[in-house]
């Protein structure tokens, strides 16, 4: 299958390209500056020219805190650009797998969020991603929107890698205990996205590491697996204020007949550590 991966130089995109190539697909890997997805005309022309069977859109503005001060850019990249890709896929007869986020939810539930739950993002990042979802649904029937959560991997900035770095610089760290989610290793999600590109079912899917934990528990697991001695002190989101609000509970579940099933998040942490050994510059 001819597969186009957008955002191919990013943390998730690189894993999707690798997974697709391992499976023997013909892969086109796009990222800036070769193709600017915010340019509707250029995106349409490029995808029509390539004629892929499917597109996996990993391109995104992912700085949750920075989005609060620059919502226009976040909306352009996460929203309008996603609509441009969907419109181009419709013209080219391609299926679209579009990656979204748990931050479309407000965190008010205390049980896993399913695909049909009402969305109500708390911040600019979540609003921008929800705008992208809306445009994809409006522009292209043959789509799969895959919401994931707390993504980490060796090829980009992420919470787990940051905490591992801090452990080499400090004797102790403070981490919040009152935000709970589904940590997801990019290397586990990527093959599921490639598989979704080959499927025919459409709509919204949730794809995240199995299980749940707080940021505090995730840090403890990472330090234990890495064998580091840095102390982890509990704190709260109120005490550890950040520019962007985050949902208190964004664990993802699924109501789909054929759900995306990923390994437990703890396995993802161990796989991440192993992958970091192969990417020493990270």
Walk through the language-model features, giving the residues of each:
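N-terminal Rossmann NAD(P)H-binding glycine-rich loop of SDR-like oxidoreductase domains
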Residues: 2-22
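A short helix->loop->beta-strand "cap" motif at the edges of active sites that frequently abuts
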Residues: 92-94
């Amino acid at each position: 299958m001819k597969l186009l991966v957008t955002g191919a130089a990013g943390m998730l995109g690189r894993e999707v390209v690798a997974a697709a190539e391992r499976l023997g697909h013909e892969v086109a890997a796009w990222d800036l500056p070769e193709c600017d997805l915010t340019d509707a005309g250029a995106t349409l022309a490029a995808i029509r020219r390539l004629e892929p069977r499917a597109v996996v859109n990993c391109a995104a503005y992912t700085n949750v805190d920075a989005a609060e001060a620059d919502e226009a850019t976040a909306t352009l990249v996460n929203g309008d650009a996603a609509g441009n890709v969907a419109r181009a896929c419709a013209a080219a007869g391609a299926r679209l797998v579009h990656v979204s986020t748990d931050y479309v939810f407000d965190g008010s539930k205390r049980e896993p969020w399913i695909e049909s739950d009402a969305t109500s993002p708390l911040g600019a990042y979540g609003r921008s991603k929800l705008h992208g979802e809306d445009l994809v649904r409006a522009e292209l029937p043959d789509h799969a929107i895959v919401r994931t959560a707390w993504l980490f991997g060796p090829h980009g900035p992420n919470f787990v890698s940051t905490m591992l770095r801090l452990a080499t610089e400090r004797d102790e760290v403070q981490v919040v205990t009152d935000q709970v989610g589904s940590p997801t290793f990019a290397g586990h999600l990527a093959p599921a996205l490639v598989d979704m590109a080959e499927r025919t079912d459409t709509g919204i899917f949730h794809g995240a590491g199995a299980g749940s934990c707080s940021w505090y528990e995730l840090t403890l697991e990472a330090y234990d697996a890495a064998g580091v001695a840095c102390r982890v002190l509990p704190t709260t989101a109120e005490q550890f204020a950040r520019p962007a609000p985050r949902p208190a509970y964004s664990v993802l579940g699924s109501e789909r007949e054929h759900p995306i099933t990923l390994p437990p998040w703890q396995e993802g942490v161990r796989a991440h550590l192993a992958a970091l050994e192969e990417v020493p510059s990270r």
